[in-house]
Curated annotation (Swiss-Prot):
<feature type="domain" description="EGF-like 8; calcium-binding">
    <location>
        <begin position="318"/>
        <end position="356"/>
    </location>
</feature>
<dbReference type="Pfam" id="PF07645">
    <property type="entry name" value="EGF_CA"/>
</dbReference>
<feature type="glycosylation site" description="N-linked (GlcNAc...) asparagine">
    <location>
        <position position="756"/>
    </location>
</feature>
<dbReference type="InterPro" id="IPR035914">
    <property type="entry name" value="Sperma_CUB_dom_sf"/>
</dbReference>
<feature type="disulfide bond">
    <location>
        <begin position="184"/>
        <end position="197"/>
    </location>
</feature>
<feature type="domain" description="CUB">
    <location>
        <begin position="804"/>
        <end position="916"/>
    </location>
</feature>
<feature type="disulfide bond">
    <location>
        <begin position="82"/>
        <end position="95"/>
    </location>
</feature>
<feature type="disulfide bond">
    <location>
        <begin position="74"/>
        <end position="86"/>
    </location>
</feature>
<comment type="subunit">
    <text>Forms homooligomers. Forms heterooligomers with SCUBE1 and SCUBE2. Interacts with TGFBR2 through the CUB domain; this interaction does not affect TGFB1-binding to TGFBR2. Interacts with BMP2, BMP4 and BMP7; the interaction is mediated by the CUB domain. Interacts with BMPR1A, BMPR1B and BMPR2; the interaction with BMPR1A and BMPR1B is BMP2- and BMP4-dependent.</text>
</comment>
<feature type="domain" description="EGF-like 6">
    <location>
        <begin position="238"/>
        <end position="276"/>
    </location>
</feature>
<comment type="function">
    <text>Is a positive regulator of the BMP signaling pathway, required for proper chondrogenesis, osteogenesis and skeletal development. It acts as a coreceptor for BMP ligands, particularly BMP2 and BMP4, facilitating their interactions with BMP type I receptors. It is required for ligand-induced recruitment of BMP receptors to lipid rafts. Binds to TGFBR2 and activates TGFB signaling.</text>
</comment>
<dbReference type="GO" id="GO:0045669">
    <property type="term" value="P:positive regulation of osteoblast differentiation"/>
</dbReference>
<keyword id="KW-0732">Signal</keyword>
<dbReference type="InterPro" id="IPR026823">
    <property type="entry name" value="cEGF"/>
</dbReference>
<dbReference type="InterPro" id="IPR000859">
    <property type="entry name" value="CUB_dom"/>
</dbReference>
<dbReference type="InterPro" id="IPR011641">
    <property type="entry name" value="Tyr-kin_ephrin_A/B_rcpt-like"/>
</dbReference>
<feature type="disulfide bond">
    <location>
        <begin position="201"/>
        <end position="212"/>
    </location>
</feature>
Length: 993
């Protein structure tokens, strides 16, 4: 992976291969070497080539392959490296040694044979070994016989030669005249005194180990070119000055020759010359946690995917992918060696890390009886006009009730009373209070049910009376009032009122004390917000002071049946408005006097506390958790789902049987529909309420007693009031069917299809939808803005985002294939343009890239100067490379194009880049072109680590910060990586040091 020339060559080879595949079938190549139709020499090798062959002479021969001649290595000046004789053989040579020598292990040197070591050399008495030969010696009183091995005892008197004083060095011969004549053994010459014998080169190579030359003074020894003569003048020893003494590595001259040694990581072999690499991984895995890879003279630890090597270069630590930017769209869970992305409720995972909204309405219409509206992360069922309101299960529609009395429902209550100059007010919510803490300094409380946004009732005037056209039409819109109060220097928090104050409030707000007792308040919405204001010069509030603002919305019912001849609906509405306004005036005074209570779930809460309280009261408010929270250690934690905050015990209590709570931090639980006080404790939603009809059943309200779904219908959910028909006249094999799969269809549809009940055929899922199951009557729409490449998709994994990814900044950025790290879609084209600031150039790092090789380069990534095919190309590839590479752009600007075919797909890429000062171009080029940057697996992992690549970019983009960088990040990078960069950066920044 690298420059544009290599991928270009690959494309050319693929093109040639494709054309050969089209036109070359008829002209099939013949292997002449196999058939024996070649005319190569017997000492040549036949090598087949397309449409021909070639002949190559074997090693040790020379020629054109059709005529080969043996090379006589013994004719070389160094005698082929042989120290004695060289014997040429066909295609090779061998070294031989003179008598008295044997061939060394290297096959070239000759070493002395110690003849005395075996059978005493055949000597009768003593044997003396010499270089290239040996001699037999006799003890005193004996002399050596003519056979030079046995010893003869000398007589005291007798023949001359038997006399011990005959004077011959070797052999004594008696002459006819009674004298003696001395002779020498073979290989010796008689000296001028006719008694002594002089050694020549013909005996034992003159005592020389290598070469011998006869001189008047005797043999003169010499050595082969790779050796030097020892101080004894006979032995040849190796020297470090010549060919490093034959050592593989380090050589030391010693009295006995050379002494070879090996560096750390190598072991000296038995020949005392060769160094062999030590495989450290064989012993205890080299101390590596995961993977040990032996290298020449050393070893390298590496980690499994999902782990990183620590600075001790032995231990592996899990990579916390969740700490990276852009790892997951929603939630990220780190796991050993990997991670998992999770999506919020109502969203579905696609492309490994992305979350898209689920269109629940495409899944069997969301289970809704009538209409379904998809919303981000959820959906909502709707009921058409005349079909009643939405059922508690959120999917069915209840039958409209024509005449419903407003007296039966629990109402909210605004109670105010005056005692002297003090006004005391309380907002009471008997049930279904919704408490929502919006922030640390704010909350909202709602009570009752807001009026629907409906048109006013049609009223028919008949004489002096007013009559509605029907009971349903007689509903009159309620009177609405909205007020806003501001309290300075107050905290916007609810605090449980102490017992004494609560009893006092009960006396003040006793029976009959409600000035608006005939005001049927149906809905209350209170919003409280505290904030610091007054930071500006013109602000009225002093800087740093807190301001609490209360916003109250009230709805009061107006009864049409209370109209009289003297007061119609407009009159009733005006009366109600005056009463509400009067109550709000008293409410304002009670708030300013800190005499306002909020009654929720039978407990009284003070809404806001002004700073005029006593020290004891203020101390009581310190570190107090707000309602809906309990203390867990030193923190305030909201009560979880399925519980409510019990103000008296200040604890979270599970919802009683027959109730549920879907929200956190609530002050009460909601009653289950049709509750008979049965069911589990701590129910978290309405579906867990007891007594619901199970799947395959229905009832009028969704609760028992239930009826099984009749044949030809089904119901997959609990608590429903109806069953869905199979459609198309289809029936089911039994009652109580729970799925369309129970419908007796005429054909069985496989995944990627849905059953059309109108034509009773299986239809392929359209592009942008999928179906993973058999025998279904719908296809699920792909999440978010994703789509599929083709129709008939069977999995959400085939849903892909077609948008080109990346962020293009002036100094740093990245490009990303669509749907990364999931497989990219087919038939897309992406174009990115990188335009760096003036006097800056572009550095690209490709950590890894995945493109299908079997696609015949249908998916291509190319980086050029511009869109013109003839412009300067920086990088081009159509293959997968998991080995990272860094390179500089060959042009100041880059036009990047990624195009995919309709065939195979792969993960694609995420490629970061950085722009650097052109003054450092030489340094940056020196770094990224050094092969050592990629030789080590640990260095490669640096280029893949999203955190380290940022740090690496700092060095490459701003080399002057290198030394500060190494101190700051020395624990992040392996020593070998820092060592690699140190010399380059130092020599560039300090060229004269």
């Amino acid at each position: 992976m690298g420059s544009g020339r290599v991928p270009g060559l690959c494309l050319l080879l693929l093109l040639v291969h494709a054309r050969a595949a089209q036109h070359g079938k008829a002209a099939q190549d013949v292997d002449e070497c196999v058939e024996g139709t070649d005319n190569c020499h017997i000492d040549a090798i036949c090598q087949n080539t397309p449409r021909s062959y070639k002949c190559i002479c074997k090693s040790g021969y020379t020629g054109d392959g059709k005529h080969c001649k043996d090379v006589d290595e013994c004719e070389r000046e160094d005698n082929a490296g042989c120290v004695h004789d060289c014997v040429n053989i066909p295609g090779n040579y061998r070294c031989t040694c003179y008598d008295g020598f044997h061939l060394a292990h290297d096959g070239h040197n000759c070493l002395d044979v110690d003849e005395c070591a075996e059978g005493n050399g055949g000597c009768q008495q003593s044997c003396v070994n010499m270089m290239g030969s040996y001699e037999c010696h006799c003890r005193d009183g004996f002399f050596l016989s003519d056979n030079q091995h046995t010893c003869i005892q000398r007589p005291e008197e007798g023949m001359n030669c038997m006399n011990k004083n005959h004077g011959c060095a070797h052999i004594c011969r008696e002459t006819p005249k009674g004298g003696i004549a001395c002779e020498c053994r073979p290989g010796f010459e008689l000296t001028k005194n006719q008694r002594d014998c002089k050694l020549t080169c013909n005996y034992g190579n003159g005592g020389c180990q290598h070469t011998c030359d006869d001189t008047e003074q005797g043999p003169r020894c010499g050595c082969h070119v790779k050796f030097v003569l020892h101080t004894d003048g006979k032995t040849c020893i190796e020297t470090c000055a010549v060919n490093n003494g034959g050592c593989d590595s380090k050589c030391h001259d010693a009295a006995t020759g050379v002494h070879c040694s090996c560096p750390v990581g190598f072991m000296l072999q038995p020949d005392r010359k060769t160094c062999k690499d030590i495989d450290e991984c064989r012993l205890n895995n080299g101390g590596c946690d995961h993977i040990c890879r032996n290298t020449v003279g050393s070893f390298e630890c590496s980690c499994k995917k999902g782990y990183k090597l620590l600075i001790n270069e032995r231990s592996c630590q899990d990579i916390d992918e969740c700490s990276f930017d852009r790892t997951c769209d929603h939630m990220c869970v780190n796991t050993p060696g990997s991670f998992q992305c999770l999506c919020h409720r109502g969203y579905l995972l696609y492309g490994v890390t992305h979350c898209g909204d689920v269109d629940e309405c495409s899944i069997n219409k969301g289970g809704c009886r009538f209409g379904c509206i998809n919303t981000p992360g959820s959906y909502q069922c709707t009921c058409p006009a005349g079909q009643g309101r939405l059922h508690w299960n959120g999917k069915d529609c209840t039958e409209p009730v024509k005449c419903q009395s407003s007296l039966g429902a629990s109402k909210a209550m605004l109670s105010c009373n005056r005692s002297g100059k003090k006004d005391t007010c309380a907002l009471t919510c008997p049930s279904r209070a919704r408490f929502l803490p919006e922030s640390e300094n704010g909350f909202t409380v709602s009570c009752g049910t807001p009026s629907p946004k409906a048109a006013p009732a049609r009223v028919i005037h008949s004489g002096n009376s007013t009559v509605s056209s029907s009971c349903h039409e007689a509903a009159v819109l309620p009177v609405k009032q909205r007020a806003s109060f501001k309290i300075k220097d107050a905290k916007c928090r609810l605090h449980l009122r102490n017992k004494g104050k609560a009893e006092e409030a009960s006396r003040i707000l006793g029976p009959g004390s409600v000035p608006c007792s005939d005001c049927l308040v149906t809905f209350i919405h209170l919003k409280c917000d505290s904030s610091r204001k007054g930071k500006g010069r013109r602000a009225r509030t002093p800087p740093g002071k807190e301001v609490t603002r209360l916003t109250l919305e009230l709805e009061a019912e107006v009864r049409a049946e209370e109209t009289t001849a003297g007061c119609g609906l407009p009159c009733l509405r005006q009366r109600m408005e005056r009463r509400l306004k009067g109550s709000l005036k008293m409410l304002r005074k009670s708030i300013n006097q800190d005499r306002f209570l909020l009654r929720l779930a039978g407990l009284d809460y003070e809404l806001a506390h002004k700073p005029g309280l006593g020290a004891g009261d203020r101390a009581e408010l310190v570190e107090v958790c707000r309602p809906g929270q309990h203390r867990a250690g030193t923190k305030c934690v909201s009560c979880p789902q399925g519980t409510y905050y019990h103000g008296q015990t200040e604890q979270c209590v599970p919802c009683p049987a027959g109730t549920f709570q879907e929200r956190e931090g609530q002050l009460s639980c909601d009653l289950c529909p049709g509750s008979d006080a049965h069911g589990p404790l701590g129910a978290t939603n309405v579906t867990t309420c007891a007594g619901q009809c199970p799947p395959g059943h229905h009832s009028g309200d969704g609760f028992k007693p239930c009826q099984p779904c009749p044949r030809g219908t089904y119901q997959p959910e609990a608590g429903r009031t109806l069953c869905f028909p199979c459609g198309g006249g289809l029936t089911t094999k039994h009652e109580g069917a729970v799925s369309f799969q129970d419908c007796d269809t005429k054909v069985q549809c496989s995944p990627g299809h849905y059953y059309n009940t109108s034509i009773h055929r299986c239809i392929r899922c359209a592009v942008g939808s999928y179906q993973p199951d058999f025998r279904q009557n719908f296809c699920t729409r792909c999440p978010g803005n994703t789509s599929t490449d083709f129709d008939g998709s069977t999995s959400v994994a085939q849903c892909k985002n077609r948008q080109c990814g990346g962020e293009l900044g002036e100094f740093t950025g990245y490009i990303e294939s669509p749907n990364y790290p999931g497989n990219y879609p087919a038939g897309v084209e992406c174009v990115w343009n990188i335009n760096p600031p003036p006097k800056r150039k572009i550095l690209i790092v490709v950590p890894e890239i995945f493109l299908p090789s079997e696609d015949e380069c249908g998916d291509v990534l190319v980086m050029r100067k511009n869109s013109s095919p003839s412009s300067i190309t920086t990088y081009e590839t159509c293959q997968t490379y998991e080995r990272p590479i860094a390179f500089t752009a060959r042009s100041r600007k880059l036009w990047i194009n990624f195009k995919t075919s309709e065939a195979n797909s792969a993960r694609g890429f995420q490629i970061p880049y950085v722009t650097y000062d052109e003054d450092y171009e030489q340094l940056v080029e020196d770094i990224v072109r050094d092969g050592r940057l990629y030789a080590s697996e640990n260095h490669q992992e640096i280029l893949k680590d999203k955190k380290l690549i940022k740090a690496f970019f700092e060095v490459l983009a701003h080399p002057q910060n290198y030394f500060k960088y190494t101190e700051k990040h020395k624990e992040m990078l392996p020593k070998s990586f820092i060592k690699l960069l140190r010399s380059k950066v130092s020599s560039f920044l300090r060229p004269y040091k």
